[in-house]
Amino acid sequence: MEINAAAAWLNSTFGNLDVSVALAVHKLYDMAGGFFTPFFEVISFFGKGGICLILLSLALLFFKKTRRFGTAMCIGLAIGALITNCCLKIVIARPRPYVDQNGILYQLWLLVGQNVESDKSFPSGHTTAAFASMVPLFILGNKRWSWTALLFAFTMGIARIYLVVHYTSDVIGGLIVGTFAGIVAVIIAKKLPQKWYELEFYKSKSSQPPDSLSA
């Protein structure tokens, strides 16, 4: 299996880490007999193509009270997708961990559903999208609940390692790119004019004058 210099460097530099963490995460499988597999598949589904996260950001964008969250999330997702999907995945072109059928990770992959992904491995797009959208919620939200946003993002990364569709270093790369995208998104969102956050995308019936007054 031929790989380019960038992918080869990742494999040689982080190979031990990738295998060690994957084996540690898979102790969950050993302890629970596959109980965690459907859970991590559901978590992973929410990051597929970023669709669920995009829909969430658009829903928050619709209402004035949550528009700052939605705006930052949309910007973060866009920045993360550009860096990850349009640049790094193409340039580095790292094969998925299950491609090497002689490796221990392939054996783990066989145990947890044999999920196949169509694009390259580094960095993790799911993890990028999770952090790019959740970091703004953490920064802008009430700290009594916003920590759960980061919990979701970290769980997404663990899910990708557990399902053996990413190396640990892929997930770390996604974490870095996603966090960067999320922070930049917050900065941009704070600099947008206040008029954007005061726009009415809809008008409730209660805001319309009664027929007797409009006649």
Kindly give the residue locations of the regions a language model identified:
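Short helix-capping/hinge motifs at transmembrane helix termini and TM-loop junctions
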Residues: F63-K64, I92-A93, L163-Y167
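Interfacial segments of alpha-helical transmembrane regions
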Residues: L56-C86
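Membrane-embedded catalytic cores of phosphoryl/pyrophosphoryl-handling enzymes
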Residues: Y106-A215
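N-terminal transmembrane-helix/juxtamembrane module of multi-pass inner/ER membrane proteins
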Residues: M1-L53, K89-N115, S206, P210-A215
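Alpha-helical membrane-inserting segments
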Residues: A59, I79, I83-L88, I92, ...
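Membrane-interface junctions
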Residues: K27, M31, F45-G49, F63-K64, ...
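Membrane-helix interface segments
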Residues: G33-F36, K65-G70, G141-T148
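Transmembrane-embedded, aromatic-rich helix segments that form part
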Residues: C52-L56, V171
